[in-house]
Amino acid sequence: MKTANKQTKLHVRKNDTVVVIAGNDKGKTGKVLKAYPQACRVIVEGVNIRKRHVRPSQSHPQGAIIEREFPIHASNVKKG
């Protein structure tokens, strides 16, 4: 992970359409939902979907297993 003091710049921004060029989701396209410049990672819509176990709460009274996107490294995407 990059240090907090160093400024980093990503080649993609939020709402850019990107193509995944490496990894399990290679070839998929999606919109960048969120970018983390310090960690050089981005969250792409419909890519790197994992299951997340959540505790019981008002929105999920019995708890649940939800699927959501997790970040991937910015070097694995290109603008498309």
Swiss-Prot record:
InterPro entries: KOW, Rib_uL2_dom2, Ribosomal_uL24, Ribosomal_uL24_CS, Ribosomal_uL24_KOW, Translation_prot_SH3-like_sf. The keyword Transcription regulation does not apply. GO terms for molecular function: rRNA binding; structural constituent of ribosome. Keywords: Ribonucleoprotein, Ribosomal protein, RNA-binding, rRNA-binding. GO terms for cellular component: ribonucleoprotein complex; ribosome. Coiled coil: none annotated. The keyword Transferase does not apply. Pfam families: KOW (PF00467), ribosomal_L24 (PF17136). Disulfide bonds: none annotated. GO terms for biological process: translation. Part of the 50S ribosomal subunit. One of two assembly initiator proteins, it binds directly to the 5'-end of the 23S rRNA, where it nucleates assembly of the 50S subunit. Belongs to the universal ribosomal protein uL24 family. This is Large ribosomal subunit protein uL24.
